[in-house]
């Protein structure tokens, strides 16, 4: 099968659209934790992936944006994160493989989590338990689940803090080393306002500077 990196040299690849907004449109009743849906509503997610593929997407992203132990803490589901990621990847893979007329790739979605390491480090709150190592460990479990579920690569999505992004990229590298894989990684950032900065106050140039050594497929 063609590596996504090779395909990108030849043509522009089309990513899918929003997952959360589509789930809301379908009116599924659930507790608001999108990342548990691979375990509870796999059929719904498969349908969404297939709808995007039928609309022309070359790449579908797993429904695992917040499937890390830090983000899942509030839902009491931190211990299910590995399973969420395996299931999320398997569902997207099944949808991608059902497309017989062309190749569709699966990217494992890893969001910024609901914590900002830069802000935590500035606040120095003695009650705060999330550190760089805690977040990196959470991303490590997520990345291993995505690899085991069969992704073609990773998308570190809507980065809001360069420190968080480095934690995710470090974890992906460690997971790939352990699993013996060399899957591509892409990164996207969320710009807050006209200043062109991300939430933690970094410019895109500063963010790029902090992640450029990670051999990203795209930024």
Language-model-detected regions and their locations in the chain:
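Domain-level signal for soluble alpha/beta catalytic cores
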Residues: 1-218
């Amino acid at each position: 099968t063609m590596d996504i990196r090779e395909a990108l040299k030849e043509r522009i690849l089309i990513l899918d659209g929003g997952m959360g907004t589509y789930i809301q449109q379908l009116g599924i009743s659930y507790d608001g934790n999108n990342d548990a849906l691979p375990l509870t509503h796999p059929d719904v997610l498969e349908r969404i992936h297939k709808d995007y593929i039928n609309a022309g997407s070359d790449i579908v992203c797993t429904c695992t944006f917040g499937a890390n132990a830090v983000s899942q803490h509030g839902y009491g589901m931190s211990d299910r994160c590995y399973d969420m990621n395996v299931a999320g990847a398997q569902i997207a893979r099944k949808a991608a493989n059902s497309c017989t007329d062309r190749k569709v790739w699966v990217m494992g979605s890893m969001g910024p989590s609901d914590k900002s390491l830069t802000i935590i480090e500035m606040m120095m709150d003695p009650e705060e338990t999330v550190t760089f190592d805690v977040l990196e460990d959470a991303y490590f479990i997520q990345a291993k689940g995505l690899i085991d579920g069969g992704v073609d690569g990773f998308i570190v999505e809507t980065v809001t803090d360069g420190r968080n992004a480095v934690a995710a990229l470090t974890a992906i590298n460690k997971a790939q080393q352990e699993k013996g894989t060399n899957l591509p990684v892409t990164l996207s950032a969320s710009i807050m306002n006209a200043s062109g900065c991300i939430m933690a106050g970094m410019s895109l140039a500063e963010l790029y500077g902090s992640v450029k050594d990670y051999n990203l497929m795209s930024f």
